[in-house]
Swiss-Prot record:
Name of encoding gene: rlmG
Cellular component, GO, one term: cytoplasm
Spans through the membrane: none
Protein's name according to its UniProt entry: Ribosomal RNA large subunit methyltransferase G
Subcellular localization: Cytoplasm
Reaction(s) catalysed (UniProt annotation): guanosine(1835) in 23S rRNA + S-adenosyl-L-methionine = N(2)-methylguanosine(1835) in 23S rRNA + S-adenosyl-L-homocysteine + H(+)
Source organism: Aeromonas salmonicida (strain A449)
PANTHER family: RIBOSOMAL RNA LARGE SUBUNIT METHYLTRANSFERASE G, RIBOSOMAL RNA SMALL SUBUNIT METHYLTRANSFERASE C
SUPFAM superfamilies associated with the record: S-adenosyl-L-methionine-dependent methyltransferases
Cytoplasm in keyword set: yes
Length: 377
């Protein structure tokens, strides 16, 4: 496992989060290195706030630590990673400011550094927010995998900020340089996206970075068709996304209490919006938590846990998140408590559940998905 980022301009020890002893993935990529090298060779001259957006595990925050950056992220895990890696490198975590991707940005930043993901909706929302605060003196530089930077990506920078150009590729990464223009007319914000949930009369609200933003994903649809109701008073919707599973439970069972948990600030905000707009009378029975799986959730906090596990972290394919979700569920559930999961058939969740719970029952399956139930003995 490579943990030392050693360049001509910095030497940092960096870990992914949560730290794993045999993690084959490193906590930075070529885009981070490209940004660090470029920023080091052209020092910041303008006074004003420094904003970092979408810093995966804190490499950019550590490098720009002397400038007390404002670190903007939709990911709770990225925030925890940033703080852990600052401490690892003996850098004061209080010198930076963490804020979620829906919070207001500081005015007139001197520098904006953006890690570009392959999800353009998040980028569009962030550029729209930047449009309201940048000035012609603001330096805007972004980076990402070359394969994720398209003409449509550059068009977003042009639309919301100003003239844009790209760099040559380096280690399969590419830079974007943008020159913000003077204050321009306000543009309509297309987020959150709103669409009807078929057969319910409900309207689903999705912020920009929520999975399956414009329609119900097929895994969630399959779980909705087989949703367990009654017999559980306290339910956790783990990895809740827009909260559609917990929302359906609140609608069907007037006694159930649902806790919506996700590591995405936008997901939890979307879940809250959906309860507020569709079932306002159920709000006293709903709780909302941004968290890394079930960290610090008390034993017995739920009788049943529903889970549609992700199999990626940022842009890396990994099964450790699903494994942590299952392990945390086993810890939190009381004897007789149930974990219900939906997943792609090829992901072998059946054997993972058997290792933890010593049982796993197929509730329903189709050509692509399987719903499994495991009971805490």
């Amino acid at each position: 496992m490579q943990t030392l980022l050693d360049t001509a301009h910095c030497r940092l020890t960096l870990y992914r989060y949560p730290r794993q002893s045999q993690d084959p993935l490193q906590a930075w990529d070529a885009a981070d290195e490209y940004l660090i090298n470029t920023l080091a060779e052209t020092p910041l001259e303008q006074a004003g706030p420094v904003i970092i957006m979408n810093d995966g595990f804190g490499a950019l925050a550590a490098f720009l630590h002397p400038h007390a950056p404002v670190c903007v992220s939709d990911s709770y895990i990225s925030e925890r990673a940033t703080l852990a890696n600052l401490a690892e490198n003996e850098l004061d975590p209080h010198a930076i400011r963490l804020q979620d991707a829906l919070a207001p940005l500081p005015l007139a930043p001197a520098l904006v550094v953006i890690k570009v993901s392959k999800y353009q909706a998040l980028l569009e929302q962030q550029l729209l927010a930047l449009r309201a605060v940048v000035t012609p003196a603001t330096r805007v530089i972004a980076a990402g995998k070359a394969k994720d930077i398209h003409s449509s990506t550059l068009a977003l920078f042009e639309k919301y900020l100003g003239p844009t150009r790209t760099s040559l590729a380096w280690k399969k990464a590419r830079l974007i340089h943008c020159e913000p223009q003077a204050m321009q007319p306000e543009l309509a914000n297309p987020y959150p996206t709103v669409w009807p949930l078929e057969g319910t009369g409900m309207l689903i609200h999705n912020h920009a970075n929520v999975f399956s933003r414009t329609s119900l994903d097929i895994g969630a649809r399959f779980m909705l068709d087989n949703l367990p109701v009654h017999s559980a008073r306290k339910v956790i919707d783990l990895g809740c996304g827009n909260g559609v599973l917990g929302l359906a439970l609140l609608a069907k069972d007037p006694e159930v209490e649902v806790t919506f948990i996700d590591e995405s600030h936008m997901a939890v905000a979307s879940a809250r919006l959906n309860v507020e707009h569709n079932l306002p009378d159920a709000l006293p029975r709903a709780r909302f938590m941004v968290n890394n799986c079930l960290d610090d959730v008390a034993v017995g906090a739920a009788d049943r846990i529903l889970c549609n596990p992700p199999f990626h972290q940022l842009q890396a394919i990994t099964d450790h998140i699903a494994w942590q979700m299952f392990s945390d569920a086993h810890r939190v559930l009381p004897q007789g408590g149930e974990l219900w999961i939906v997943g792609n058939r090829h992901l072998d969740y059946h054997n993972k559940l058997k290792r933890l719970f010593a049982n796993a029952q197929v509730v329903a399956s189709n050509s692509k998905f399987v719903i499994l139930k495991a009971i805490k003995r």
